[in-house]
């Protein structure tokens, strides 16, 4: 979302606080990979952002063959009720550059390892890539040449869910109801149309996963369907 959209969400969600920066300048310009969190339940212990590029600490840096500047925002949270700590990374991969997608996946995994260590980790975002893409395979450790250390890789909550997936299998529809309906009813290979993911590792148990395709006042609230999950930190 852009800053005005972040502000709208903030006004509509008074029980939530948020963190993040604009991807174009590291301040307010451009899209955010903002993280909203329930402030009565979670305490932010530390947070930051990095760019999906060869120079991840340089604000506004464009990576590889990407068409747009891309960013990841992360935070370390403490659950005020249980005392459990975990990290959440929210990202948005490029929609054009295949090399950028794969390199972004490698960078993201490296940053997660460096920043979060052995803490429980949740990764959310629009990855703009399908399950048979190199980027997805890197994220899940299935790519050729991937390191064998399983701690470096993530698990797709869609498959880890103890109670399966609720709702749609399409996460992007572009506001087009007919496309959504055709993809669901005609047996379209969902691996080619699911591009939004929740990944987990290090003691995260996924109870439920869902892709919600409901409308609000007769209209989809976004060109992507919300992807949600119920999780438990089990360690």
Residue ranges of predicted features:
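Short, glycine/acidic-enriched loop or turn micro-motifs at the edges of active sites
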Residues: 2, 95, 129
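Hydrophobic/aromatic residues located in beta-strands of well-ordered beta-sheets
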Residues: 18, 88, 121-123, 154
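Metal-dependent phosphoester-hydrolase catalytic domains
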Residues: 41, 99, 110-121, 129-235
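Short, solvent-exposed aromatic-acidic interface loops
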Residues: 49-57, 93-94, 161-163, 211-216
